[in-house]
């Protein structure tokens, strides 16, 4: 008896948005770039690790640039013209990711710094006794 092959169909349609929000999370070890709509629903994302960088190369500004370039290419499917940029974290790839978003032709209205600053939050670890 011959097996029937089923055709995979996707009913998912690409949402058309005019304005979006670009979130850049630049940590010490990785940079994650996410594009959301104004309500915060994720449309596409990329990271330095997802672009193929491993180990200490993942934390470089070049890896962040490649992640932002990948997200900007994906954002063309949504016909996004303008965006706000929200930057979080102390990592190296912040400026290079922002620059890459500008190069992609997306009009940027606001660049906002969202890095959390502790008001003497967590207690530091106990001193080593040798």
Swiss-Prot record:
Principal localization reads plastid
Compartments, as annotated in UniProt: Plastid, Chloroplast
GO BP term, example: translation
Q: Name one GO molecular function term.
A: structural constituent of ribosome
Question: Record's InterPro entries?
Answer: Ribosomal_uS11, Ribosomal_uS11_bac-type, Ribosomal_uS11_sf
Keyword Iron recorded: no
The answer to whether keyword Plastid applies is: yes
Pfam families on file: Ribosomal_S11
Q: Which UniProt keywords apply?
A: Chloroplast, Plastid, Ribonucleoprotein, Ribosomal protein, RNA-binding, rRNA-binding
What are the annotated GO cellular component locations? chloroplast; ribonucleoprotein complex; ribosome
> Partners and quaternary state?
Part of the 30S ribosomal subunit.
Q: Indicate the family of this protein.
A: Belongs to the universal ribosomal protein uS11 family.
NCBIfam families, alphabetized: PRK05309.1, uS11_bact
What's the further remark here? This ORF was detected when the sequence of the chloroplast genome was revised.
Entry protein name: Small ribosomal subunit protein uS11c
Q: What is the protein's species of origin?
A: Chlamydomonas reinhardtii (Chlamydomonas smithii)
């Amino acid at each position: 008896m011959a097996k029937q092959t089923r055709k995979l169909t996707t009913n998912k349609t690409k949402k058309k948005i005019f304005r979006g929000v670009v979130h850049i999370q630049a940590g010490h070890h990785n940079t994650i770039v996410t594009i959301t709509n104004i309500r915060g629903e994720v449309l596409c994302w990329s990271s330095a690790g997802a672009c193929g960088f491993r180990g200490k190369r993942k934390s470089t500004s070049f890896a962040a640039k490649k992640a932002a370039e990948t997200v900007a290419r994906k954002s063309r499917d949504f016909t996004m013209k303008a965006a706000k940029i929200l930057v979080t974290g102390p990592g190296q790839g912040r400026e290079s990711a922002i620059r890459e978003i500008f190069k992609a032709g997306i009009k940027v209205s606001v660049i906002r710094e969202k890095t959390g600053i502790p008001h003497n939050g967590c207690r530091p670890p106990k001193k080593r006794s040798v």
